[in-house]
């Protein structure tokens, strides 16, 4: 099934006229879940028993802090993706925008209007949930029309909007069916259609593809991109999947433990990660990390690992000089696709060779560091076996240098 992209642009095709665009501003937003009776002692004891989870819990005298110091300006018609591991606060943030969670502190503005205390129904937003949230006893048509009926929209207008949305999503043939007769992908289309007919200022999506299998998820991801161009509104999308974030977002907000780690375009967060967490979270396979030495010689910078030494690029040297970075021990990051098998360089032992079709993923051990090297099959001169010794190198232009003390990228 595909979105109906053969139609004329929506403005010419009778799209719902009321769809408007909006800016969204979140200013120093904080969310604390207060303790209920007896819960404070339990939470503190849990943190003491599991010290490795203290940061995730963020237990204070106020309660459990879910989101902190969250500030973001979302432009008109922008597609923003909130991404991060489970428990990072991304869904909580989305629910605060929707009005489903109270904001403990900070300001939320939609089109310049403060909406902290405005109920969800009056915020002019629509939300698509992970579990579809369809009424099982209603047909697809009735599900899509339900919110409009509650607003006492005339029947003729309801019919027009429902059929327009159904045509966009290519679900016209299912309008008389009930949800149980639909596949997961078709149900998700209905959930999206129900949001479209409301003509919202802001469209919110909370992990809408996570219940789908991998193949259908890939198809729906591409079609959400097409849909975004058709309805032309502001999107805030939540996911834990960095592939979804990279392919869908105009900008990505990467979160961890309730804090924003970095905001940027997909290219910015991939090529210039702000810290060790972002570097390891964005990109598949994950970035390789090494204990290394950063060496400054005048205005030149070199990195040295396992006896291999290379100079950083002029752009990186310029940024390090601006920050007056001195020689120090660092965590060095290099992506697998930027790591090359070579005649000389860092020595490593092959542990696993994964044939991926157009490339081989070599899993090697270099002085205790697990390293992945992506080798294009066109560059292979033979097969790699477990126990083989290989050497790898990398260019200074693709090396990322992180502080051992703070985990921050030293170029920032």
What is the predicted role of each segment?
Residues 120-281:
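ABC ATPase nucleotide-binding domains
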Residues 83-85:
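The feature captures the beta-strand-to-loop junction immediately N-terminal to the Walker
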Residues 98:
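Helix-to-loop junction immediately C-terminal to a conserved catalytic motif
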Residues 70-81:
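Pre-Walker A (P-loop) beta-loop-beta motif of ABC nucleotide-binding domains
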Residues 106-114:
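Conserved ABC transporter NBD signature motif
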Residues 2-3, 38, 287, 297-412:
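Non-catalytic connector elements of ABC transporters
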């Amino acid at each position: 099934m595909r979105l109906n992209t053969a139609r004329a642009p929506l403005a010419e095709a009778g799209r719902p006229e009321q769809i408007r665009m909006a800016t969204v501003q979140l200013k120093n937003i904080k969310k604390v879940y207060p303790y209920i009776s007896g819960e404070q002692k339990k939470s503190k004891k849990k943190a003491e028993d599991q010290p490795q989870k203290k940061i995730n819990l963020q237990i204070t005298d106020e309660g459990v802090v879910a989101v902190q110091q969250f500030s973001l300006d979302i432009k008109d018609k922008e597609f923003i993706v909130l991404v991060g591991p489970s428990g990072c606060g991304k869904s909580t943030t989305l629910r605060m925008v929707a009005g489903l969670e109270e904001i403990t502190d900070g300001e939320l503005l939609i089109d310049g209007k403060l909406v902290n205390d405005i109920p969800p129904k009056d915020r002019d937003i629509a939300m698509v949930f992970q579990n579809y949230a369809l009424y099982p006893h209603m047909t697809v048509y009735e599900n899509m029309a339900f919110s409009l009926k509650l607003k006492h929209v005339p029947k003729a207008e309801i019919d027009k909007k429902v059929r327009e949305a159904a045509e966009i999503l290519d679900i016209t043939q299912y309008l008389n069916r009930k949800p149980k007769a639909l596949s997961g992908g078709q149900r998700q289309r209905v959930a999206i259609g129900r949001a479209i007919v409301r003509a919202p200022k802001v469209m919110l999506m909370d992990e809408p593809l996570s219940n789908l299998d991998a193949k259908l998820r890939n198809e729906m991801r591409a079609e959400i991109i097409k849909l975004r161009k058709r309805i032309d509104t502001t999107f805030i999308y939540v996911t834990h999947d960095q592939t979804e974030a990279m392919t869908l977002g105009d900008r990505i907000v990467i979160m961890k433990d309730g804090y924003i780690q970095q905001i940027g375009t997909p290219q910015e967060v991939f090529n210039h990660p702000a810290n060790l967490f972002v570097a390891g979270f964005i990109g598949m396979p994950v970035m390789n990390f090494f204990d290394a030495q950063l060496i400054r010689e005048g205005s030149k910078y070199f990195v040295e690992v396992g006896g291999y030494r290379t100079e950083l690029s002029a752009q990186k040297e310029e940024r390090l000089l601006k920050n007056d970075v001195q020689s120090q021990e660092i965590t060095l990051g290099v992506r697998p696709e930027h790591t090359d098998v070579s005649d000389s360089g860092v020595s490593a032992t092959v542990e696993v060779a994964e044939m991926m079709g157009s490339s081989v993923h070599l899993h090697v051990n270099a002085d205790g560091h697990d390293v992945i090297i992506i080798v294009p099959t066109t560059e292979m001169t033979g097969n790699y076996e477990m126990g083989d010794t290989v050497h790898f190198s990398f260019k200074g232009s693709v090396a990322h240098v992180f502080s051992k003390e703070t985990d921050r990228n030293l170029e920032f």
